[in-house]
């Protein structure tokens, strides 16, 4: 399901410093997975920038026809 156009759209969005997500290709949809441990240690303004990045990446993928789920791994 993850096409070359989706890859280009996803990589055109620049992530904030020291923040990355995992993009998982499920057969019928894509998942953007946040690392909650990294996210929890971020300053407030950095969290806002990170979430804006995730929303922009989600929107870019959806513009290329993807169904996108955003999730995180819970801290235990």
At which residue positions do the language-model features occur?
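Short, surface-exposed beta-strand/loop "edge" segments at domain boundaries and coil↔beta transitions
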Residues: 37-42, 76
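Short aromatic-glycine-(Arg/Gly/Cys) micro-motifs in beta-strand/loop hairpins
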Residues: 20-39
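N-proximal, solvent-exposed amphipathic alpha-helical segments enriched in charged/polar residues
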Residues: 1-19
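A short amphipathic beta-strand at an alpha->beta junction
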Residues: 59-76
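A short, charged, amphipathic alpha-helix used as a generic interaction element across diverse proteins
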Residues: 45-64
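Generic structural motif
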Residues: 17-25, 68-72
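Generic short N-terminal amphipathic or hydrophobic helices
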Residues: 12-13, 23, 31, 74
């Amino acid at each position: 399901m993850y096409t070359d156009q989706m890859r280009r759209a996803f990589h055109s969005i620049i992530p904030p410093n020291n923040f990355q997500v995992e993009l998982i290709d499920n057969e019928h949809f894509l998942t953007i997975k946040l690392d909650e441990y990294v996210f929890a240690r971020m300053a407030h303004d950095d969290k806002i920038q990170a979430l804006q990045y995730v929303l922009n990446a989600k929107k870019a993928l959806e513009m290329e026809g993807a169904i996108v789920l955003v999730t995180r791994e819970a801290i235990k």
